[in-house]
Swiss-Prot record:
Protein name according to UniProt: Holo-[acyl-carrier-protein] synthase
HAMAP family on file: AcpS
Organism field: Escherichia coli O139:H28 (strain E24377A / ETEC)
EC category name: transferase
Gene3D superfamilies: 4'-phosphopantetheinyl transferase domain
Record's catalysed reaction(s): apo-[ACP] + CoA = holo-[ACP] + adenosine 3',5'-bisphosphate + H(+)
Function of the molecule: Transfers the 4'-phosphopantetheine moiety from coenzyme A to a Ser of acyl-carrier-protein.
GN (gene name): acpS
Family to which this protein belongs: Belongs to the P-Pant transferase superfamily. AcpS family.
Keyword set, alphabetical order: Cytoplasm, Fatty acid biosynthesis, Fatty acid metabolism, Lipid biosynthesis, Lipid metabolism, Magnesium, Metal-binding, Transferase
Gene Ontology MF terms in the entry: holo-[acyl-carrier-protein] synthase activity; magnesium ion binding
Length: 126
């Protein structure tokens, strides 16, 4: 296997909170997949949940080398946890097509948060 890309992002949680206060659910709708949306709606810490998802998706877009453009959208990157609780990525739509085109066979996700920040790193491999 070879590393195709590496992306890291850090999000100030208060910034996400301010956006939600200003525009309601609009950011969550733009960022979250349908499955993530269902979790977010009942999550005991929805702002922190959204900040962490946003960080992973930004990191993934950086790892793919594209950013969020040319048909890619945040909600095409879905963060879920495997049976051990490890964060993983599932791709949809244009993100999945890009991964197939690049020959991506594995994606590694690490996610951390503290009081004020959420941070994520994504590595994609061929």
């Amino acid at each position: 296997m070879a590393i195709l890309g590496l992306g890291t992002d850090i999000v100030e949680i208060a910034r996400i909170e301010a956006v939600i206060a200003r525009s309601g659910e609009r950011l969550a709708r733009r960022v979250l997949s349908d499955n993530e949306w269902a979790i977010w709606k009942t999550h005991h810490q929805p702002v922190r949940f959204l900040a962490k998802r946003f960080a992973v998706k930004e990191a993934a877009a950086k790892a793919f080398g594209t950013g969020i453009r040319n048909g890619l959208a945040f909600n095409q990157f879905e963060v879920f946890n495997d049976e051990l609780g490890k964060p993983r990525l599932r791709l949809w739509g244009e993100a999945l097509k890009l991964a197939e085109k690049l020959g991506v066979v594995n994606m590694h996700v690490t996610l951390a948060d503290e009081r004020h920040y959420a941070c994520a790193t994504v590595i994609i491999e061929s």
